[in-house]
């Protein structure tokens, strides 16, 4: 596997640019934690990377989420690891929070709690979360703009309310001999023949 690409923020390369990195936090689908590390160890680690890391808030949220600060993260459930990753991201104090399938592995109550955290930071400190998800309904109550990626490119980028009114999923079986060329004027994302 050979991946080629770059990431620019404010027209600056992110790679090895500490000022730009300090403004962005990434929560992957499978969060990484220090080997044998605890939540406390992760807090100390991220305090060294993110100058605006709010340790007091992290400690308070850790208690609210009932996550033990001295327990090894490797013993946490998948949902607990996701919660910890979100708390670290929120408390990093960055302008941007990049999230990959952040709500996967969280129970419904915890999903709402995490959404409330995001909404609070959007309102209080103008946080911009960028959330990748296969579940658009999951994001309706916290997102106002949606971009759809398809085959490595941006298929569309729209205000969520506009998108709800103008985009429809239609699945149909066409008679033999009818192909996509017969459907001119319709923006087709995917066709499948059997």
Where are these regions (language model features)?
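Catalytic Walker B motif of ABC-type/P-loop ATPase nucleotide-binding domains
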Residues: 97-101
């Amino acid at each position: 596997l050979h991946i080629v690409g770059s990431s620019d923020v404010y027209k600056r390369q992110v790679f090895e640019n500490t000022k730009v990195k300090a403004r962005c936090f990434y929560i992957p689908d499978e969060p990484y934690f220090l080997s044998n590390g605890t939540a406390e160890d992760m807090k100390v680690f991220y305090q060294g990377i993110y100058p605006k890391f709010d340790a007091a808030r992290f400690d308070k949220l850790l208690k609210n989420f009932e996550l033990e600060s001295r327990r090894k993260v490797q013993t946490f459930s998948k949902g607990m690891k996701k919660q910890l990753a979100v708390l670290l991201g929120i408390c990093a104090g960055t302008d941007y929070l990049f999230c990959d399938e952040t709500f996967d592995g969280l129970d419904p109550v915890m999903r709402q709690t995490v959404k409330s955290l995001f909404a609070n930071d959007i309102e209080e400190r103008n946080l911009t979360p960028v959330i990748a998800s296969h579940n658009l309904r999951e994001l309706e109550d916290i997102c106002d703009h949606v971009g759809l990626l398809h085959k490595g490119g941006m298929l569309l980028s729209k205000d969520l309310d506009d998108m709800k009114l103008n985009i429809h999923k239609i699945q149909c079986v066409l008679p033999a001999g009818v192909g996509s060329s017969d459907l001119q004027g319709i923006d087709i994302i995917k066709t499948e023949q059997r």
